[in-house]
Amino acid sequence: RTRNMRSLPGSHGLGHVRYPTAGSAMNPEEAQPFYVNAPYGITLAHNGNLTNSRSLQREMYALDRRHINTDSDSEVLLNVFAHALQDLGAASKLESMRAHHARVQLSVDEIFAAVSILGERARGAYAVAMQIANVGLLAFRDPFGIRPMCLGFQETDQGTEWMIASESVAIEGLG
């Protein structure tokens, strides 16, 4: 509801209005966006399909020790990305910063490296929007750019507002 959204603090948000891309469309547990709290607090929404979702889910459990709770390929994508950040050594940096009550500082190189790792592991066509807690928004497509992704903005009294969507009609609706 609009009145509920207006009371939320912060200047970033991530939403999804499309049915789940894999699994059961009737299962509310598969509604996007998906969230993991480790290593940083990452939220993901995506449009697309993974062709290796099942095998990647098994691989994530056996090798990466990550349990996927649903049949959604979105949750698989999220965990592949989160694990890549963790493997890049970012998790140890996070623990050090938490101990000193400092904000997490991820480098652009670390984030892009995690996206590259995801692109190497995940097969299929996808457009992804993510929010990393205390860092910001991230958007990317599969390595072949099969799924569309649009970037829009509008100037307001509070500054520039940015929007990422898998179809331009979502942005055009803002005026």
Predicted regions: what is each one?
Residues 1-175:
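Conserved short alpha-helical segments that host acidic/polar catalytic motifs at enzyme active sites
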